[in-house]
Amino acid sequence: MGIRFLRSYTPGTRNRSVSDFNEITINKPEKSLTFSHHRCKGRNHRGIITCRHRGGGHKRLYRQIDFQRDKTKVPAQVLSIEYDPNRNARIALLRYPDGEKRYILHPRGLKIGETVISDVNASIQTGNTLPLRNIPLGTEVHNVEFQPGSGGQLARSAGTLVELLAKEGDFVTLRLPSKEIRLISRHCWATIGQVGHVEAYSIVVGKAGRTRWLGIRPTVRGSVMNPVDHPHGGGEGRAPIGRSRPVTPWGKPALGQKTRKPKKQSNKLILRKRKK
């Protein structure tokens, strides 16, 4: 995978870069694994905005991804590497001997024609899935489960990986992409390797309209709003916020306020907090 830099034909192409899509081998997705997808645009079931700056964007079809890899002891062949508009990682299409097809996250280095398997005693090979207790120390993994059988939830974004540091008792120690070190049950499963499309975060958007294509709306400062819209709003000209500390549009403390519950049960499993 590489990055292609555009020439300065217009202000929108100046310093703009895009993926060259060289690793993509097919243009149309597997029809049986593709569904229409209604995006909530930041609203909850009552239509109230719970996540601001979401809405619009290009229409997308959802690709059903197999995060659980629950078809065990059956090898699968990699048919193609495809683009997925719903994530920044690429996806790989697998075909099992019985004809079933499934999508998985494309691990870095996995090529068409290779075979992957999900098994307790699977070999340490890129794309294979097995329990953490059977993975050697120092191995890079992705798509890691939080709870046994829950399906992969950790390290699913492009270029991410989790490093296995230690094993002790019923837990293994992992270093997450955020540099947080925490304990996970040794019975959780993970996939060997790093998620592909490593250069995804080096791509320069280049213009505001490209962000709108992704369904991200502009972020407006509260100090330039009216008092009815934000606690920071109002005043003549560039007025200060008029408070001892910044707050959210709903009056809750913002910018540095910790949001994790101090008595959360899983806090005892975190050995070192993440780095911001």
Curated annotation (Swiss-Prot):
The biased composition feature labelled Basic residues covers 258-276
Family to which this protein belongs? Belongs to the universal ribosomal protein uL2 family.
Q: Which GO terms describe its biological process?
A: mitochondrial translation
Subunit structure, as described in the record: Part of the 50S ribosomal subunit.
Query: Where does the source fall among the domains of life?
Result: Eukaryota
Q: Where is this protein localized, as stated in its record? A: Plastid, Chloroplast
User: Which PROSITE patterns does the entry mention?
Assistant: RIBOSOMAL_L2 (PS00467)
Q: GO molecular-function annotation terms?
A: rRNA binding; structural constituent of ribosome; transferase activity
Region annotated Disordered sits at 221-276
| Entry's transmembrane regions | none
Q: Which NCBIfam families match?
A: rplB_bact
Protein name per its UniProtKB record:
Large ribosomal subunit protein uL2c
Q: Name one Pfam family in it.
A: Ribosomal_L2_C
Q: Which UniProt keywords apply?
A: Chloroplast, Plastid, Ribonucleoprotein, Ribosomal protein
The record's annotation in PANTHER family points to:
LARGE RIBOSOMAL SUBUNIT PROTEIN UL2M (PTHR13691:SF5), RIBOSOMAL PROTEIN L2 (PTHR13691)
Record's InterPro entries? Answer: NA-bd_OB-fold, Rib_uL2_dom2, Ribosomal_uL2, Ribosomal_uL2_bac/org-type, Ribosomal_uL2_C, Ribosomal_uL2_CS, Ribosomal_uL2_dom3, Ribosomal_uL2_RNA-bd_dom
Any one GO cellular component localisation term in the record: chloroplast
